[in-house]
Amino acid sequence: MKINFNNLEDDEKMELIIRKIKEDDYQKVFVLTDIHGRFDLFEKLIEKIDLKKEDLLLILGDSCDRGKFSFELYNWYEEMIQKDYNIIHLMGNHENMLFESISDENFRLNWLYNGGNVTIK
């Protein structure tokens, strides 16, 4: 189900997607959060859990900032989704700061202070 908030100003528009997840649809369900650009540790974890296409990887946000490898994380997610892996990534407060920082100077300073400075290096 998609809910559009079209009554907001253009720069405030949001889309809410509500999706029912039935755990019986997957062999295993893995839930991760706050990876913060640590692709090096994430790779080790994925190897250890031996993620399969029949599994679900649910990421509760905050993949970016603080660690040096935010781009690599999002790139990995995209590649695995293209290979038909079941990956759902929710927007965390760090993703929100990143997007808000594009058009809002106050958010930009807050984002940089909270680890965005490492992301853009």
Q: Where do the protein language model's features map onto the residues?
A:
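Active-site neighborhood of divalent metal-dependent phosphoester bond hydrolases
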Residues: R66-K121
